Each structure stands twice: as structure tokens, then as C-alpha cells.
Design a protein with these regions (language model features):
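Active-site neighborhoods and metal-handling regions in enzymes and metal-associated proteins
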Residues: 1-380
């Protein structure tokens, strides 16, 4: 595995820069602050990783400070976890974390909320400080998160390289008679052995007609000698995701599949070619559908054809902005990273999804992983 090298890391200096940009947004919009919940946005800005529960834990970012809002009995644990320096403020079991936040914000200021916060906590804050003082912080937060830094792109690249290597090992493993559950277990083991955060974040392994279901079928499957194979999997490195899909057959000769595979690859290439700085995300989805329409597939979301959007952003979340979908007029910018996967579904027969990811540079699009070479050659 010649791609292996030291794993890139997000430094404290980079997190401080992110925080500085967030504060610029806070001041620019006349906010008292932004409240981050136990979401990937908390990790993005502060480095603190926390799994959500009914007890609120998060961070209040103001123009001059960062304060961590922590259940009293969790203080010692939080102090041991990596996070940017800031005051730790405690609330006890009989107290209201929403009331504590209201006191910190003070009178009159508006508080922008992490859009990953649960609805029940929004209601608690509205009761404590008034709904008119709450604002949606999602646009500000996600506007920063969707432009990846060089370090973030390096982490995604590392994760993609790792998963592509696992895909190659799967291809070598597959033979008629193997069960999909065996392959899923193998994928997880290989990701773990290669150093992924928690093994596979997911693994979809489908054979035959099950490949026509975009997210796979329930139950175990056995690979037949003439089955179409779809493998979609990914992992995380320091929180950043990979996500790659390959669809292929072990032997050639199925003309219907091979023709459909080449249409899929043509559509995938059309998305790449349409990816230009300033282009609307929707235009990439349109490019894929034009290819399919040329081959009498679709139109729109009709089957046989493409039943879903052509791609999604990824980073600390496997699905995040920007979304490559109709109606999204977000302009592509350098640093954006997103999938290219205009799947073609032939109901109850087979589906073909070739998924590779793109990062936008000042000079245009760049593949994280080279596209598949052919219907029986899943790697370049």
C-alpha cells in the first residue's frame, strides 16, 4: 500500500482560524453568539467530540469567548478530551441548561443555533429566552464547513485511498458462493487493520437484482456466477469520511449490463466535465440526466433511470453540503468536496452505481479516486 504515510491532522491553529471566521460572521450578522450542540460542528470548531444525549453539552461562541456548557458530573471527562481552551460552565441535574445559556447571552441579544440541535432543545431555549431571540445558525456554520482546507482535503484523500485499497481486496476475494455478510465482515476487518477510526462506517454489498435497490436489500445474499456485484463502503480518518462504490461482474459477456455500465460511466464523466468554478450544483445533476435521456432513460426520476440526486458533499458528515441536486443554485467554489454517483436503476434486474468523489480546485475539478476502467475492471 504505497499510498500510506503519516495521517494528516487538524491543528489547533486551524481550529482557531475556523473560530475566527465564525466570530466574523457573528459580528457581521449582529448576533450575541452561536450555540454549538454535540454535533460534528462542535468538533469542527473546537475539536471536542461528544455523542448526543438528553443532557445538553455544547459550546457558546461569542465575539470574545468560548464557553463549554457541560453537565456537572461530566466535567472530569470533558477536561481529558481534546478541545480548544475555554471556560467550562456546569449545570446540575435539577437545573436547566437552557436557563444557563440564557443568562450567559444576557438581555436583548440574538443567539444563532447549530442546525443539528434537536427540536426539544430549541423549545427549551425558546421558553428560557424567547423564540424571537433565536436565529438559524445553519447557513453561517455550513457556509464555513463546506469549503475544505488543505488539511481536510488531505484527510479525505487518505480515507479514500484506504477504502479504495479495501475495494481491491474485496474484488480479489469475491467468488461464486460467497455470502454478502461474509464480504461485509471482511470489509470492516480490513478497514480496522488499515487504521480507520472505527472500521467501516457502512458497507453495502449487493448481488444480482438486489443491486437495483440503491441502499441494498435486507437479508443475506449468495453470489451467483453471473450476478452483478455492487459494493459501496467507507470509513473515517480523524472524523473525515470516505465513500466509494463499484459495480461490476466477475466475467464479461452480458451485453445488456455492459451497455448500461458504459452509459453510467458516461453520465459520471459528464458530471465531472460540468464541474467548474461558479457552476450551479444543479447543473451537474442536469448534465447526468441529459446523458441518460440521450439513451432513452428517465426522464427525471423515472425508472429505468436515475432515481435520486447525482451527488452529495462529504467531510465530517458522510452527507453534507453541497448537494448535487436539482434546484440547488449554490455555486461551486474551490475547496468543495462532493460525490459523483448518477446511479442507473433497472427495476428488479440490476442497478449500476459508480461513485467517486471530486474536490474543486482553482483550476477545476480533481478526482479523489480514478474512475473504474470497465464492466469487469473496477479499478483504473
Amino acid at each position: 500500500m504505497s499510498w500510506q504515510h503519516s495521517v494528516p491532522r487538524i491543528t489547533e491553529d486551524e481550529r482557531q482560524l475556523r473560530l475566527s471566521k465564525l466570530r466574523q460572521g457573528i459580528e457581521g450578522e449582529g448576533l450575541a453568539g452561536v450555540l454549538l450542540g454535540p454535533t460534528e460542528s462542535l468538533r469542527y470548531f473546537t475539536g471536542l467530540v461528544w455523542h448526543p444525549s438528553e443532557r445538553f453539552l455544547g459550546a457558546l461562541v461569542t465575539p470574545s469567548a468560548i464557553s463549554y456548557i457541560v453537565p456537572g458530573f461530566e466535567r472530569s471527562r470533558v477536561e481529558t478530551l481534546p478541545h480548544l481552551p475555554g471556560e467550562i460552565l456546569l449545570w446540575e441535574e435539577e437545573e436547566s441548561s437552557a436557563a444557563l445559556i440564557s443568562r450567559l447571552v444576557g438581555q436583548g441579544g440574538r443567539l444563532a443555533l447549530d442546525d443539528g440541535l434537536p427540536l426539544y432543545f430549541y423549545h427549551a431555549l425558546a421558553a428560557a429566552m424567547g423564540a424571537e431571540r433565536l436565529a438559524d445558525g445553519g447557513r453561517l456554520i455550513r457556509g464555513l464547513r463546506r469549503i475544505k482546507s488543505a488539511a481536510e482535503i488531505a484527510l479525505i484523500q487518505y480515507a479514500m485511498n484506504l477504502t479504495l485499497d479495501v475495494h481491491k481486496q474485496v474484488h480479489a476475494l469475491l467468488k461464486p458462493g460467497i455470502r454478502s455478510s461474509e464480504v461485509v465482515d471482511f470489509i470492516d476487518r480490513q478497514h480496522r487493520q488499515a487504521g480507520a477510526d472505527d472500521g467501516s462506517t457502512f458497507a453495502i454489498v449487493s448481488f444480482g437484482a438486489a443491486t437495483s435497490l440503491p441502499h441494498g436489500a435486507d437479508g443475506d445474499q449468495v453470489l451467483g456466477p453471473s450476478d452483478v456485484i455492487l459494493v459501496d463502503t467507507g470509513c473515517r480518518i480523524d472524523g473525515y469520511h470516505s465513500d466509494i462504490t463499484r459495480t461490476y461482474m466477475l466475467e464479461g459477456g452480458d451485453r445488456e449490463f455492459e451497455r448500461a455500465w458504459r452509459i453510467e460511466r458516461e453520465a459520471q464523466q459528464a458530471v465531472f466535465d460540468a464541474a467548474r468554478i461558479g457552476a450551479a450544483c444543479a447543473s451537474l445533476d442536469d448534465a447526468a440526466r441529459k446523458v441518460l435521456a440521450k439513451h432513452s432513460l428517465g426522464p427525471d426520476y423515472r425508472l429505468p433511470g436515475l432515481p435520486h440526486r447525482a451527488g452529495h458533499g462529504l467531510g465530517l458528515e458522510i452527507h453534507e453540503e453541497p448537494y448535487i441536486v436539482r434546484g440547488n443554485d449554490t455555486a461551486l467554489a474551490a475547496g468543495m468536496c462532493f460525490s459523483n454517483e448518477p446511479m442507473i436503476v433497472f427495476p428488479e434486474k440490476f442497478g449500476i452505481r459508480l461513485e467517486d468523489h471530486i474536490t474543486m480546485t482553482e483550476d477545476g475539478p480533481r478526482w479523489f479516486t480514478d474512475p473504474a476502467a470497465g464492466p469487469t475492471e473496477p479499478f483504473a
